[in-house]
């Protein structure tokens, strides 16, 4: 059996909001598999899927660029090791220059950027290495995407840690900005229920079925419970199904219809999203927090 460490219990508690002993027991039953343990706890507690915020550990910036005509744009994430470097002007400018380069070269594969020249003539890789020497931290170009809009593009950057690019048609620039801001706040998975990944939906359906079975109700009632939860889940994770953040009385879908507008696609980047937190000594962390509170 895999060893269940304090840091594993801590991470599961952060993901689920449940008690230490419940988390430790679930990890033991799941053989140390974090995802399986989370699913076990969801079945028992009826909880929703976690936002996995506890796993976001990297520093860096999200930068973006859109051409004046709104037809081309790019979004990029560049990582560093500390918040201090993430606020450095040279680092921020480097990320901005990369976004512009992606647009001018129509590049989405960031691996192709390395040997491309920036405005000053130096290659991306040589500038990156020079920044590493100057700032004393590893700097990596994590991901990026370039757009050729079907309609036109809107972008929203929340500080430099969250970035959204939306391809939409109809409405005006203010609507595009509002939709991008909504996506940053509500973090939908996709535009419509038809775009929800099949494996993700099936996984949630299995969880809902197991949760409903815990009620001990007849099969026909369980089936209705599951379908109700699936419908609610689809509304929560799709852009069109979500209540609009600036007016929760209407959904985004209703807002778009009143403006004769449509959203064809969007990209949402959050700095460090999906990067696993480094294992820390849980006891040492607790002691550090106690010392700081004195």
From Swiss-Prot:
Principal subcellular localisation of the protein: cytoplasm
Keyword Cytoplasm attributed: yes
Region annotation Involved in Mg(2+) ion dislocation from EF-Tu: where it falls in the sequence: 82-85
GO cellular component, one term: cytoplasm
InterPro entries to which the protein is assigned, alphabetical: EF-Ts_dimer_sf, Transl_elong_EFTs/EF1B, Transl_elong_EFTs/EF1B_dimer, Transl_elong_Ts_CS, UBA-like_sf
Entry keyword set: Cytoplasm, Elongation factor, Protein biosynthesis
Pfam families, per database record: EF_TS (PF00889)
GO molecular function: translation elongation factor activity
Function: Associates with the EF-Tu.GDP complex and induces the exchange of GDP to GTP. It remains bound to the aminoacyl-tRNA.EF-Tu.GTP complex up to the GTP hydrolysis stage on the ribosome.
HAMAP family noted in UniProt: EF_Ts (MF_00050)
Protein name, UniProt field: Elongation factor Ts
């Amino acid at each position: 059996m895999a060893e269940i460490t304090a840091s594993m219990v801590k991470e599961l508690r952060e993901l689920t909001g449940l008690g230490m002993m419940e988390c430790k027991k679930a990890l033991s039953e799941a053989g140390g598999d974090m995802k399986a343990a989370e699913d076990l706890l969801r079945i028992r507690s009826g909880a929703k899927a976690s936002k996995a915020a506890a796993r976001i550990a990297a520093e860096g910036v999200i930068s973006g660029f859109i051409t004046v005509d709104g037809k081309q744009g790019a979004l990029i994430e560049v990582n560093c090791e500390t918040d201090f470097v993430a606020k450095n002007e040279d680092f921020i400018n480097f990320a901005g220059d990369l976004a512009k380069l992606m647009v001018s070269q129509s590049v989405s594969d960031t691996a192709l950027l390395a040997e491309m020249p920036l405005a000053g003539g130096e290659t991306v890789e040589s500038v990156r290495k020079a920044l590493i020497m100057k700032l004393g931290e590893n700097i990596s170009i994590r991901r990026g995407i370039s757009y050729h809009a079907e309609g036109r593009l809107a972008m929203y950057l929340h500080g430099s840690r969250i970035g959204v690019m939306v391809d939409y048609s109809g409405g005006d620039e203010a609507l595009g900005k509002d939709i991008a801001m909504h996506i940053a706040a509500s973090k939908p998975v996709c535009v419509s229920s038809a775009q929800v990944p099949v494996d993700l939906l099936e996984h949630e359906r299995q969880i809902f079925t197991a949760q409903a079975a815990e009620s001990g109700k007849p099969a026909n009632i369980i089936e209705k419970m599951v379908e109700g939860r699936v419908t609610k889940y689809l509304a929560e994770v799709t852009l069109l199904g979500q209540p609009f953040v600036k007016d929760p009385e209407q959904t985004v879908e209703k807002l778009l219809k009143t403006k004769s507008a449509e959203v064809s696609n969007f990209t949402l980047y959050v700095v460090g999203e999906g990067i696993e937190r480094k294992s820390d000594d849980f006891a040492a962390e607790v002691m550090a927090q106690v010392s700081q509170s004195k």
